[in-house]
Amino acid sequence: MNLASQISQAKTGNATMEWAKNYVSKLNDGQLALLQKMYADHQAKLKASEDEKKKKEMEELKMKAQQQAILDSLTQQIPIMVDVLRSSTSPDSQPSSSSSVMSSTDEDQITVKDVLIGKINKAQRQSSPNSSKPYTPRGIRERVLFDEHLYVFDKCSYDSKKRFFRCERKNTCPARIHTPFDAERVIHKVQVHNHPPPTTFDLAHYNIDYGKVKSGHILSLNGPQQTKNLLPPSLLTPKSDLEDETLSTKTEQKNASTMNILLSMTNNCDGRKPITLRLPDLFNKISEMEIHDMEMTLTKFLLENRELRTDLISRNGDLPVFFPNAHNDELVLFVADQHENDSVFQMIRVSERNEKSIRQAIQEHLQKVSNRSLMMNISSKINVPLSQQMIDQWRTEEFIRLDSSKPNFWKIHHVSKLQD
């Protein structure tokens, strides 16, 4: 069956698998490469659409989970992280000068109920400043021992890399120290103490192990976990005057169990180790069975796309265009060896459209040097120097065969049709 009958059979729609096999076997390397490229692009588009669809579904599920978590935190009173402004003295006993009030911001775990009760109590204090209820601090700050003096935790730096401590007598003593977030050493001291260090009798109730005291390091006397244990139950979870004590205890147990479940889930997720895959340096040769499967897949793709069959038949050896949207000033050369019939075209990008840039790009590709200008082959006996006028007539993509057998006489053979 000749080519004309194959074309007529394809146009009439009577294409069979046998016809497709015969047709694909007669395609040259350029046409097969174009067919494979179009098939790969088609598969890539399908995969991209599926990935985008999965990504949207994951985002929707994540958004629903976040909304459900917020709803649960509001209805079930799951602990949330809020900033609590705390002072060491009673609001009634604080002086009017703002400079003498030493307070800072800490992060505590409290419930939505506690926030609402705190706002109600604050409104009551503002409406009745002479309230009969005594002021009680909400917690105990972390205390450390350094250079025979006691320091109280102040705050963390804005980048969460350092912690700031101030002297225990913070209202009268200006001494400060800075420590790293992940180490118990002092990296900076600010000013000096204006009072003598506390006596051994004053530090007796801390049970200090002086054997662990190191020069330049701090010794924690009550860490964040110990601080919570030192607080009485009435300060850990504030209770409303109208709420029963038994009900609040059950609520605390429920919140604690919920937080334990969330922490265990977080720890399990954090324990996952990333897996890194590395492609092999050398790939094994493709077997005949795999080649047959690839040909059958391409044949099926060819049978399903009538426009592709018509496009391949009408090309008739025309040069492919890989960069249709390239700018007119750009130049890409596909270079092959003139003395090898099966030589593969290698892509070379040229920085500027002139002979010097073309020669320099070819030299970098071949790892050779030519001291003379490139020659353009016109016929078997005529070779002329490559001029700027010739280069200006070139397209953005040009196929050439290079004869570099003579060191200072490189000849360029222009390719206009792909060989069958």
UniProtKB/Swiss-Prot annotation:
Keywords: Metal-binding, Zinc, Zinc-finger. Gene3D superfamilies: 2.20.25.240. The keyword DNA damage does not apply. Transmembrane segments: none annotated. GO terms for biological process: negative regulation of DNA-templated transcription. A zinc finger (FLYWCH-type) spans 140-195. It comes from the Eukaryota. Residues 123-134 have a biased composition (Polar residues). InterPro entries: FLYWCH-type_ZF (IPR052887), Znf_FLYWCH (IPR007588). Signal peptide: none annotated. Residues 87-107, 119-138 are annotated as: Disordered. GO terms for molecular function: DNA-binding transcription factor activity; sequence-specific DNA binding; zinc ion binding. The keyword Repressor does not apply. Residues 87-104 have a biased composition (Low complexity). Probable transcription factor. May bind to the promoters of target genes, including micro-RNA genes, in order to repress expression, and acting redundantly with flh-2. This is FLYWCH transcription factor 3.
